[in-house]
A protein has these predicted regions:
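Acidic, proline/glycine-rich low-complexity IDRs
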Residues: 1-10, 141-233, 237-238, 407, ...
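Elongated alpha-helical scaffolds
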Residues: 62-83
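Short, flexible loop/turn elements at secondary-structure junctions
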Residues: 71-75, 89, 182-184
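A short acidic (Asp/Glu
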Residues: 78-87, 189-191
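Aromatic/basic-lined ligand-recognition segments
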Residues: 82-109, 203-204, 208-209, 213
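Compact, glycine/acidic-enriched structural inserts
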Residues: 94-134
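Tandem repeat scaffolds
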Residues: 197-424
Length: 424
């Protein structure tokens, strides 16, 4: 086999399997230890802020507008998983005097080294058609996949890390973007601060313009956006904290990683939206519609890798009374201490969902997938479950006696009426 034939064969039969194996290992590590990783990331972030703060004073630097973590391929080529961290003013790339320090991402890029070992071992079967320099070049190209986990961890950790006194001590603009990318190349916002006082009406008018790209990674905190029509829009990774979106229509939206903490969302319509990794903790969602949403934790396809998996959607300590989650995908969702009285979960995937200490009186679980769901301490008086799921539920004696068990015939009739209603 000559080199022309060998390289495509090598990429398909050695590199691709090694990539998938390494990324699946990294995915498992990230999902299992993400809270520990986030704590370590926050500690690094505090150290970075301290160093940048000293640099800012030494250089008599004006207000900072951007904090950018950039992968250095030159460092990667010599085995170091180093990102340069630059604090710049509002001019960003045009700031000729940035404050700089470093971030070590070995926790993620060590899996790239494992992949390198795998493909270096695999190249030997190709004799001299695949060389060590070929492997080095392939590894540098493959780094982009592992780099995505650095982006994902920053997104996960920053809502907490940003509260640190070390960051507060920096002198910053009213609008600050924290970004992760490659050096002098494409980067993306992982957290944005916007302290400007904005008028709700002007924000509504801006959204009404309907730009396809402008609403992702945005800040919509402390605004009255109630009764708005926002369906089929892309708000990925935006924040709506302490805001009012009661009676708003957000069905069919891209809402990945959005944050809605401490907001009023009464009767809001989120049906059929993508809500992977969203956070609704401490919010009022009574009567809200989450029917058909996609929000399960993990990879989009459990047996293949296309992008990093999402963390779980969370409704901890929220009011969801009379809300609807019919046919929603909610594997590993967090409902800890939430008010879920009268909620309809019919047909939903609630595998490994957490309902500890939740209020679930008269909630409907008929036709739902509830394997390994945790109901410890939950009040489930009058809640209805499919009788076929009795052995799958880990309920105490009081809970077992308090629920309604729906027989198969009644379940089938109920679900048929719910999903295939007949006009009368």
């Amino acid at each position: 086999m000559d080199r022309t034939e060998a390289m495509p064969h090598f990429m398909t039969h050695v590199v691709k399997p090694a990539r998938v194996l390494a990324l699946m290992r990294l995915e498992k590590d990230f999902q299992t230890h993400k809270n520990t990783l986030a704590t370590n990331w926050t500690n690094d972030f505090q150290r970075i802020c301290n160093q940048l703060g000293r640099e800012q004073i030494r250089k008599n630097k004006p207000l900072l507008g951007h904090l950018t973590f950039s992968l250095l391929r030159t460092e990667l080529a010599v085995g170091r998983a180093i990102y340069v961290v630059e604090a710049t003013d509002s001019s960003w790339f045009f700031d000729r005097n940035p404050c700089q320090t470093e971030y070590d991402a070995s926790w993620a890029l060590r899996y790239l080294n494992q992949m390198k070992d795998e493909i270096d071992s695999g190249r030997k079967a190709y004799m001299r058609a695949i060389t060590l320099p070929d492997v080095e070049q392939i590894v540098l190209r493959e780094a982009v996949h592992f780099h995505q986990y650095v982006i994902q961890l920053a997104r996960y950790a920053l809502p907490t890390a940003i509260q640190s006194p070390e960051f507060a001590a920096l002198s910053t603009e009213d609008v600050v973007e924290i970004r992760v990318g490659e050096y002098m190349d494409v980067s993306e916002v992982v957290y944005k601060i916007d302290r400007r006082v904005r008028d709700a009406q002007s924000v509504r008018e801006w959204i009404d313009e309907g730009s396809e790209q402008e609403y992702a990674y945005e800040v919509f905190d402390r605004l009255d956006l109630s009764r708005g029509e926002y369906s089929e829009m892309d708000f990925r990774y935006s924040r709506f904290e302490h805001s009012d979106l009661s009676d708003a229509r957000l069905n069919g939206c891209v809402l990945l990683g959005t944050r809605w903490n401490h907001s009023r969302l009464v009767r809001a319509d989120f049906s059929y939206s993508l809500l992977f990794g969203a956070n609704f903790d401490h919010s009022d969602l009574s009567g809200a519609d989450f029917g058909g949403i996609q929000a399960s934790k993990g990879l989009l396809e459990p047996d293949s890798w296309e992008m990093p998996g999402f963390w779980e959607i969370s409704f901890a300590e929220s009011n969801l009374s009379k809300a609807s989650f019919i046919d929603a995908q909610l594997a590993e969702a967090q409902f800890r201490k939430a008010n879920l009285a009268g909620v309809n979960f019919a047909g939903a995937d609630l595998t490994n969902a957490n309902f500890t200490d939740a209020h679930l009186r008269e909630a409907v679980f008929v036709g739902a997938s509830i394997a390994s769901a945790d109901f410890t301490g939950a009040d489930i008086d009058g809640a209805s479950f499919s009788v076929k799921d009795r052995d799958k539920l880990n309920l105490d004696e009081r809970q077992q006696a308090a629920v309604l068990w729906i027989e198969a015939e009644r379940e089938e009739a109920y679900l048929h009426e719910l999903f295939y209603p007949v006009s009368r």
